[in-house]
Structure formats: C-alpha cells, structure tokens
C-alpha cells in the first residue's frame, strides 16, 4: 500500500476517532462573506455565509462533496437561490460540509487549506468536476482520488507539495468533525443534501423553493 493510501486512510481513522459522522451508502460560482448572528442561527466558526444576516429566513445547507444529488442542487438550483433569494436580501444562507466518507474528508481538508475567500469557489469546482475525482464515477483507487484532488487544488492555486501536506495534516480534523457532530445533535442529519430552514430540517430539495416562500410569508 502506497504512502498516499496510508495518508487517506489515516485521515479517515482520525476523523472517526474525533467523532465525525458518515452516512452509510452513497446516494454558479459562490462568494464567501463573514458569518454574522441571525435569528435562530447558532454559528460555527467554520461557516461560510451569504446574504442578509438580519433576514427573517435562515437557510443552512448540509452537503457532501461526493454527493451527486448535492452537485445537482448546487449546479442547477443554487443559481436561482442566489439570484432571487440571497442577492435580494430575503434570506441568510449558511453552507456546511457533512462528511459521508474518506473522499469527502480529503476534499474538505483541501478546501480549508486554501485562503478563506477561495473556499466556496473550490467547493463549487468539486461539484462541477465530481466525475473526475469521485470513485463512484470510476476513479479506481485512493491514489487516483488523491491525484485528481491535488490537481483541482492546483487549479485553485495550491502547489502539489502543499496539497500533500494539507491532506496529511491533522490541524483541521477537530473543526471538520465538529460540523458533523453539530448537525447530528441539533438536526438529526443523516443524509445529504439536508436543508434547515429556520430550524426545520428536511433531506433533499423536493418543493425547495415552495418551502422557502412559505417561510418568508410566515406560513
């Protein structure tokens, strides 16, 4: 087994030991702004947010980089969400990564090692290029996943040596674990994507905009 394989497996083991949660089974561009208090919202230090922090509706999205349904939402539904709800100040949007497996952990570590203002654009790139790095799409091995993720990180400005060090580092593991722990404890998150609208969680995005509109109208 290669060194890179051991690095990836080591990341997974450390996260499990730290309390990270994983869902069994596998089912445009964004801007990061500073997190701010909003009604019914308890921020985590790692949150990435957009929109009006004083909005009457707070939307928290829990998504996994390896989740095809999450990618579908981010690529095909998020542009409308941003244009009609976030940019207009109707809602306060919070993005959180929820780990389903080791590939998510490696991807999230790389996202966190980039400058904060590149986190969401890299996350967007992960979804857009999911077929190039996620084993569900035929990437044959941990080494293949590693190489593909390092390449994507390189496109975001991180050199390969820094990417390898980032993946091997344990510095972000507690923060990564905390997101999963918090989601399970507060909202019983057990699948991705899950959307929490003013404290009410629902997996998937059936009637998504209808739910937002009802929350905005107070129904």
Indicate residue ranges for each PLM-predicted region.
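A short beta-strand-turn-helix
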Residues: 40-57
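Structural alpha/beta surface segment adjacent to cysteine/selenocysteine redox centers
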Residues: 63-66, 71-154, 215
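Hydrophobic alpha-helical segments typical of transmembrane helices
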Residues: 45-46, 77, 148, 179
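Ser/Thr/Pro/Gly-rich low-complexity linker/stalk segments immediately outside membranes or between
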Residues: 26-38
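Envelope-exposed proteins and targeting segments
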Residues: 55-58, 89, 106, 191-193
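Residue-level signature of catalytic and energy-coupling elements of molecular machines
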Residues: 59, 67, 163
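C-terminal cap of thioredoxin/glutaredoxin-like
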Residues: 1-29, 64, 151-219
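Soluble periplasmic/extracytoplasmic beta-strand elements of cell-envelope proteins
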Residues: 58-61, 92-95, 194-196
């Amino acid at each position: 087994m290669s060194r890179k394989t051991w690095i990836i497996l080591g990341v997974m083991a450390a996260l499990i030991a730290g309390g990270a949660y994983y869902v069994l089974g596998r089912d445009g561009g964004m801007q990061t702004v500073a997190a701010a208090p909003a009604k019914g919202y308890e921020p985590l230090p790692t949150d990435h947010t957009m929109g009006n922090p004083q909005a009457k509706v707070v939307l928290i999205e829990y998504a996994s980089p390896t989740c095809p349904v999450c990618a579908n939402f981010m690529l095909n539904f998020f542009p409308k969400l941003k244009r009609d709800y976030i940019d207009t100040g109707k809602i306060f949007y919070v993005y959180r990564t929820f780990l389903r497996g080791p590939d998510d952990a490696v991807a999230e570590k790389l996202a966190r090692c980039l400058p904060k203002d590149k986190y969401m654009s890299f996350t967007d790139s992960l979804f857009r290029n999911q077929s190039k790095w996620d084993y569900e799409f035929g990437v044959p091995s941990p080494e293949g996943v590693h190489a593909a993720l390092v390449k994507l990180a390189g496109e975001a400005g991180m050199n390969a040596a820094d990417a390898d060090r980032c993946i091997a580092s344990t510095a972000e593991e507690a923060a990564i674990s905390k997101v999963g722990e918090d989601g399970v404890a507060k909202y019983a998150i057990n699948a991705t994507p899950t959307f929490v609208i003013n404290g009410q969680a629902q997996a998937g995005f059936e009637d998504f905009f209808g739910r937002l509109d009802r929350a905005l109208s107070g129904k």
